[in-house]
């Protein structure tokens, strides 16, 4: 899930290019300079979002709240006393392509342009089968506990991102009315999403206690049959990122131009912690009956590939 932090290098490179470009443009004609505003709209494809849920998890038989007398729970078992936090679910989601719109204010130095940009986008959501993280023997051992009618799922929904970036563009001026340009930018995104994982156990009629060696009935307390475990939490935060841009400007007059632009943007991981909504149809607590059942989430792959069109007006 962790990726190298290349964004700071982009910031340094951006500043160097800006200073170099500004020096080169010191003698530019006055008519090439000035403030401008741009409005744009288009589509942004969010690509694949990766999630990782990490938590402390115990075998079902360890849950003291499943017994009429908590002393009947095998709390002395090594597995019941293991409070190591491990990856539980590791999944990916396709958030699809949705509308994106933005506004920018910039200053034109001739070939070099400096710009402040705000882009807003709302992506879709996706529900996928829950995927057990590799190496987690506890959650893997519960595979035969889940309902065959309503199997475990994970869902990401309500994804939104408000991005604030500083961009630098270089215009490749020529004799035509079309001006190609390249750009780089860096900034942050105020990101929001909802994540859910839902686990429903078999009922007794569906065979919850139909076990085969080495399992015994003690591994499947009857009170757990048909129970629901649900984690449903909203995550939000500011994540740093960078983008690469390219496009064409077409002059419509002395002050107005039409812009077509493509972008590739990537942002850092969004992380957070939440408490489960319900665990085995009782309070969201660990197997000891008191410790809150918390989970840590990481979301990687935040970014987009987008195309937009808009108008730029020079003051």
What are these regions (language model features)?
Residues 1-32:
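Cleavable N-terminal export/targeting peptides
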Residues 22-38, 48-57:
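Outer-membrane beta-barrel biogenesis signature
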Residues 32, 109-112, 173-177, 251-253:
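Outer-membrane beta-barrel channels and translocator barrels
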Residues 36, 100-104, 165-167, 243-245, ...:
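Membrane-embedded beta-strand positions in outer-membrane beta-barrel channels/transporters
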Residues 47-96, 119-163, 189-239, 268-306:
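Extracellular/periplasm-exposed beta-strand and loop segments of Gram-negative cell-envelope proteins
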Residues 107-109, 170-172, 248-250, 264, ...:
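Residue-level signature of outer-membrane beta-barrel architecture
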């Amino acid at each position: 899930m962790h990726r190298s932090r290349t964004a700071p290098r982009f910031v340094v490179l951006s500043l160097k290019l800006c200073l170099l470009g500004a020096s080169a443009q010191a003698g530019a004609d006055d008519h090439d300079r000035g403030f401008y505003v741009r409005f744009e709209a288009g589509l942004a494809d969010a690509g694949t979002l990766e999630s990782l849920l990490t938590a402390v998890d115990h075998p079902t038989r360890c849950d003291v709240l499943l017994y009429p007398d908590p002393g009947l729970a095998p709390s002395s078992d090594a597995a019941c006393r293991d409070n190591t936090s491990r990856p539980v679910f590791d999944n990916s989601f396709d958030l699809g392509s949705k509308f994106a719109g933005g506004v920018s204010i910039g200053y034109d130095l001739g070939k070099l342009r400096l710009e402040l940009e705000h882009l807003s986008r709302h992506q879709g959501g996706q529900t996928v089968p829950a995927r057990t993280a590799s190496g987690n023997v506890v959650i893997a051992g519960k595979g035969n506990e889940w309902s065959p009618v309503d199997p475990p799922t994970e869902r990401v929904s309500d994804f939104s991102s408000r991005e604030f970036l500083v961009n630098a563009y270089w215009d490749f001026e020529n004799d035509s009315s079309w001006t190609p340009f390249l750009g780089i930018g860096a900034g942050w995104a105020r990101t929001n999403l909802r994540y859910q994982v839902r686990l429903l156990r078999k009922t007794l009629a569906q065979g919850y206690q139909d076990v085969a060696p080495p399992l015994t009935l003690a591994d499947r307390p009857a009170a757990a049959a048909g129970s629901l475990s649900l984690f449903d939490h909203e995550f939000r935060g500011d994540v740093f990122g960078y983008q690469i841009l390219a496009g064409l400007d077409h002059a419509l007059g002395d002050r107005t131009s039409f812009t077509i632009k493509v972008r590739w943007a990537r942002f850092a991981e969004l992380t957070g912690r939440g408490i489960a909504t319900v665990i085995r149809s009782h309070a969201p607590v660990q197997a000891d009956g008191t410790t809150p059942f918390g989970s840590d989430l990481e979301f990687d792959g935040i970014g987009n590939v987008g195309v937009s069109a808009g108008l730029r007006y020079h003051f």
